[in-house]
Amino acid sequence: MPRPAPARSRLFVVACACLVAASPIARAQAPGPPAAQTEWRGVGRVIAFADVHGAYDEMVTLLREAGVLGAQDRWAGGRAHVVSLGDLLDRGADSRKVMDLLMRLQSEAQSAGGALHVVLGNHEAMNVLGDLRYVDPGEYAAYVDLEPPGLRERLRAAWEKANGPGSGSAFDQKFTPGYFGHRVALAPDGRYGRWLLGLPVAVVVDDTLFMHAGPSAVLRGMSLADLNTRYRTALVEYARQYSQLEQAGLLQPGDAFAARPQLATERLAARSAGGQASPEFEAAVKGFTDADAHPLLNPDGPNWYRGAALCNEVAEGDVLAPLLEQFKVARVVVGHTPTRNLRAVTRFDGRVVKLDAGMNKAVYKGRGAALTIEGPKLSVRYSGEAQATVPAPEGLYVAPNSVADAAVTAALTAGTVSVTGPRGPAELDVVIEHEGRRIPGVFQQRSAGDARKEVAAFKLDRHLGLGVVPATVVREVQGQRGVVQARPAKWVSQADVQKQSLRAGGWC
């Protein structure tokens, strides 16, 4: 049975709950209205860019070169429609400036007869919901002016009272200057949170669907309006349920995002053990757990799903094709997944365009990329390059981590094999070391004939361009004949799924 929290911990929980509940962080949510329209036909010229991640200067440079910004960085796009694919936030210090500019440009574009559409990315949703794993310290610092007067001091005093004299430095490290201003501004009823919650998760312009990550089977049967309404409802419901638990002290500022359901459950159990539980608390924890598990907010959701960006085209085509037909479009343009060559590429015979070329140079070493669509013609303009180019096909198979198969098979053949443990009947987990590279893999005991079949399956897979079978060579390990396959640490086969009754992930 869980034990009640120590008195000092309970004191800080109560103090935080009272202070935060009295602040704008946990007021009753009043998000902005949803986008009135999410589909436009007959536009003619569309420009799109992806994943700014706080790189304000790079974004401005790109939009100037693409003709979207003119004198004094005002709207110069005329009647064109411009689409941001989201992920404005995190990893870069200037995300507040990015939002300020795009909010202004939306109004200016409308006045000029054009439009600026901002599609919600997973990092916007994460910030609104308090998942702050990727917030750059400079992003917090940009919100110092929005911290409620006295809130930091009161919370710091409560922390020190709960944790003892001298513990304030730990508070300062956990909640850096601007943290509470950031939470106020990006809360569902905050200046930026209201704007973000009013953004669509997907838009259609002419014959193109624009979405941050990609469409999955979860979207089957939904209209574009349904998708946007359901996604926004899921975000608002999560925020509402979280607010209730925070005010009740069952969740606290700074709790790890992924641990929230477990923490709320454990704290509820501790209260029950102390005779302080109530049906209202139990219902609140249940409601929050359900909101956290909503399929649109999880790996199959439109802000996370990478199937169209990464999965085998033969298998994923059965997912993609009916969804494009469902939304009555010829293609989908996505960000979220940086391309390996940091250039815009196409997949599925042009039905998917991957546009995340790593605009934030400090993090991704890439460049801004602006895709222009005019009828059937697609071209990409990169920052600092004078000429636009046509996005090239990525190809059916791309070697993992950009390591060529020849290099992998050479390492598997000549490298030193170390056994790390048993994997299953006649199988061992191994590590292959070769020329400074460590490759995780699996050794499978096989007869000479079966080993040749395994290698033949690998070669046929590559000949067909599928990329399903891992690199495979014939080897002896611990005196046993068989094959060694290179496999990522968390790789599982369909046989593993069946044997262990595993729950499959959201994409390949």
PLM segments and residue spans:
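Bacterial N-terminal signal peptides that target proteins for export
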Residues: M1-V13
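Short linear motifs in intrinsically disordered
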Residues: P2, G190-R194, N360-V363, T413-R423
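Intrinsically disordered, low-complexity regions enriched in serine, threonine, proline
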Residues: A5-A7, P24, T472
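Bacterial N-terminal signal peptides
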Residues: V13-S23
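Feature recognizes metal-dependent phosphohydrolase scaffolds
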Residues: R27-L396
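FAD-dinucleotide binding site
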Residues: H212, S402, T413-G415
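Juxta-kinase regulatory segment immediately upstream of eukaryotic protein kinase catalytic domains
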Residues: G395-A407
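Conserved ATP-binding subdomain of kinase catalytic cores across diverse folds
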Residues: A406-W507
